[in-house]
Amino acid sequence: MTRLPPRPRVLLADDHIRLREALRDLLEETGFEVVGESGDGADAVAMARQLEPDIVVIDLRMPVLNGLDATRLIKDGRSATQVVVLSAFESPELERQAREAGAFAYLDKGTMARRVHRVLLSAAVQAVLAANLGPPGREAGAG
């Protein structure tokens, strides 16, 4: 039986340090382990490759490399890691773009506080499944 890790590992990437601090506190209080933090998209990609977190939470608008491009690179390099894109904008078009880039979910910062725990738990489950079964659409053992 596939089980969640005791504390799903999360990398936070946002150029606003206060938001990262608030999100880190919320996640750690609810059982997640924040394994790293980044203030720009390129650094977030490098950290995701090095740390191999279960989940990357990344802002859409980041210096150096935006959140959509960073998501594509993270998903290309480690398909089991789930990416949750944050944005100040509630936009179906941006959500569609985030999902096309490989994001597990898109959260607008206005409603994030109410939804982040549930969305990240779902992402942790998907990360475990992807690590054990391969990317969605592939059967276990298919190569």
Predicted regions and their residues:
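Receiver (REC) domain active-site loop signature in two-component systems and cognate sites
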Residues: M62
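Non-catalytic signal-transmission and effector/linker regions of two-component phosphorelay proteins
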Residues: M1-R9, H117-G143
